[in-house]
């Protein structure tokens, strides 16, 4: 689309996708995961990869922030990226990309994640539009049901052509570019990992996953299931549609109309 900004993404073994951003003037460069499952911008200290020095920026403004000097988990240890840039809603925390919205620059953004780790182009994030080279047909759009994550309702979940019955009354899900796997209720994921075959149904449109799409390569001859169990939340049964789901489906996050759209990736 005219006026869109394209960010090239790097695919790290199908486990994470990250691209480059610049902070300040002149820009100090970082590689970050663009995460639709959070709203925070994490920039690590000099003890990690890159360091943001506010005094080197002519556009830096005093603002409230939280500095973590010690982290129990090894979040960024041995990672190829420096930090995380959240693309979710301000209910969690006011995200950086809201500045683009408030300036009238961006009403939507879209992801294409390349499954082929051998190709130079690992993926693509487009702020402000879509890249027609990376999807086929029309997108199926669903309304955002809760402005915390990019959350929407889904119908029944099938294993093969058989209903699991668990989500027949309806479940909630959100598309999360910062999560590697596809997480769902333990009862269903246990069945899926036993049968190793799954589909999700929404608005009478089926979005299927083939074994090539949900099985990850491990060491040597090892294969890893792309499904992981997660018990019910306060919002009820919840699915996190991570990169396993977003790779085969070009995904649009439409803030202007509060919609999430999926089309076959190309």
UniProtKB/Swiss-Prot annotation:
GO-annotated cellular components: endoplasmic reticulum; extracellular region; membrane; protein storage vacuole
pH dependence: Optimim pH is 4.3. Active from pH 3 to 7.5.
Descriptive protein name: Cardosin-G
GO molecular function: aspartic-type endopeptidase activity
Enzyme nomenclature, EC number: 3.4.23.-
Biological-process GO terms, alphabetical: proteolysis
Protein activity control: Inhibited by pepstatin.
Keyword GTP-binding belongs to the record: no
């Amino acid at each position: 689309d005219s006026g869109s900004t394209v960010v090239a993404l790097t695919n790290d073994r199908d486990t994470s996708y990250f691209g480059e951003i610049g902070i300040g003037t002149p820009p100090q460069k970082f590689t970050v995961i663009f995460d639709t499952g959070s709203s925070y911008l994490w920039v690590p200290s000099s003890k990690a990869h890159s360091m943001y020095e506010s005094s080197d920026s002519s556009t830096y403004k005093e603002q409230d922030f939280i500095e973590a000097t010690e982290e129990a988990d090894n979040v960024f240890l041995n990672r190829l990226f420096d930090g995380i840039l959240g693309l979710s809603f301000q209910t969690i925390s006011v995200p950086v990309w809201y500045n683009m919205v408030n300036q009238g620059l961006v009403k939507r953004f879209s992801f294409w994640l390349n499954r082929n780790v051998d190709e130079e182009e690992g993926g693509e994030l487009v702020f402000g539009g879509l890249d027609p080279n990376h999807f086929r047909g029309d997108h199926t759009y669903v309304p955002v049901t809760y402005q915390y994550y990019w959350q929407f309702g889904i119908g029944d979940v099938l294993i093969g052509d058989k209903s699991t019955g668990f989500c027949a009354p309806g479940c909630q899900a959100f598309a999360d570019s910062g999560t590697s796997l596809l997480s769902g209720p333990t009862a269903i994921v246990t069945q899926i990992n036993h049968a190793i075959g799954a589909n999700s149904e929404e608005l009478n449109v089926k979005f299927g996953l083939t074994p090539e799409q949900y099985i990850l390569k491990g060491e040597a001859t090892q294969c890893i299931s792309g499904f992981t169990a997660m018990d019910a939340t306060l919002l009820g049964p919840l699915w996190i549609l991570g990169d396993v789901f977003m790779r085969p489906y070009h995904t649009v996050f439409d803030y202007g109309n509060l919609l999430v759209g999926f089309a076959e990736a190309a």
